[in-house]
Amino acid sequence: MENYTLLPFFGYLCANFPKRTNRKAIRTHDMKLTPIDRAPLLPLALCLVAGIAVGNPFGTGWPLMVVAGVLLAVTLLAGRWPLVQSLGVGLCFVVLGMLVAPAEEGGVADGVWTEAVVASPIAERPKTVMADLLLTPSGERRRCYLWKDERSLQLKPADNLVVSIHDRQFVSRDGWQRGGNGLSHLSAFQRLRLKALLWREWALQRLHASAADADAQAVVAAMVLGDKRALTRELRDVYSVSGASHVLALSGLHLSIIYLLLTRLTLGRHRFWLGQVLIVASLWAFTLLTGLSTSLVRAATMLTVYALFALGGRRHAPLGVLSFTAIVMLLFDSSALFDVGFQLSFMAMLGIILFMPLFDDKSPGLKSGIYYKVTHGAGINYLSRGWWDGIKRNSLGYLLVSVAAQLGTAPLIAFYFGRFSTWFLLTNLVVIPLATLILFGAVVVLLFPAAAGLLLMVVGWMNAFLSFVSRLPLASIDHLQPSVLQVVLIYVVIAVIYALLFRLVGRRR
């Protein structure tokens, strides 16, 4: 048997890039595997997460490097004991996670004047102006509140400042002035990101060309460009109670819709490779334009890997791709692990990857999914053929994806936000098709601003529907306060449910 223990990444590639020969044997082998069996990178990703969560107890990297060297040597010498090799590789990734774990915050002391660069659009508050500042040359990023006046209201991304910060976030009226050369300390990528924020401001002006409902404009800005500054507290509560907050936060849902649109617009099969290159470049350009949120980076990375598989004519293991994406993102920015958006994005995708094969009648390794049984019953197709059949099947697909994603994220949502939306199925059945229409319409509005009125009218309909859902009886269960242990136990119960469902649905022989 081939052993990929020492080279997990290349082993993963070999496992997912089978030779074109003996396809029947490959299919027979795949039928016996669960999604977890097809993800050899999953244990390594979990080990990396564990190392980052533990952190570096020594304060310096040298002791950990010595430990990593010893573990690597033992792993290389343990060729006759695969279990020892596997444990060695896992421990190496734990140590790697400890090495890349974010250090404790230090940074610039209070009251010290330092150069800074405005790294976000300003957001007005009753008495202050909120903005993210990049403190140079240390590179520390802080969310600061400046005294609101005519000067602070004119700030924009990429402006050079000299500031004196108190209590780590407050800047007085006389505590800042324009000047310095902070941009020179930034990398080319950071300067490009600041330039992208200016482009986003231009795009926002195009979207706001129509003097329509302010709430509708705020929703379009959040959905299309990730700008939530104009969202009122009441509007946020409506989306939260109805279970549609994920629509306001740019995520894999939005990027998948854009991917679908670009796929329809690209060239034919004889130019397939060029179409995939253009699609991937466009996805990353959009991700950069909207601020490189963790959920979008996750989705863009996964779609890029999928495009590479498509160009090679190979199959992919979604859970393996998700694990690879987590490893890459955490190695570049280990602090992302503690970001709520990162956790929700990966857990939602994990729920979809694990549970959707149980619902889908075309999934390998299953006799017939729940999706098949619901739509066909005991050998009878209750859904008529044709366009009406397509509407029903797509509607059921939206519901099943919502359930799968909710199974992955509900415990975390209850832990962080203390709320569970009970009408999320009804919400997603209407909101997901409307979100698709709104994103398509936003592209048209960027080219033809005169069409903004029609787009904002559709958004107004969506807002009205969500407002209706938020007023339904028992629209949400509030004041939930689960502990970390309770969240872990809930996920254990979900894992048991998954195992039982997998056995219930059955495998092909």
PLM feature spans:
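Membrane-helix interface "capping/anchor" motifs
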Residues: 38, 77-86, 267-275, 310-321, ...
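Short aromatic-glycine-enriched beta-strand elements
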Residues: 123-132
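Aromatic-rich juxtamembrane segments at the membrane interface
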Residues: 32-38, 46, 170, 174-308, ...
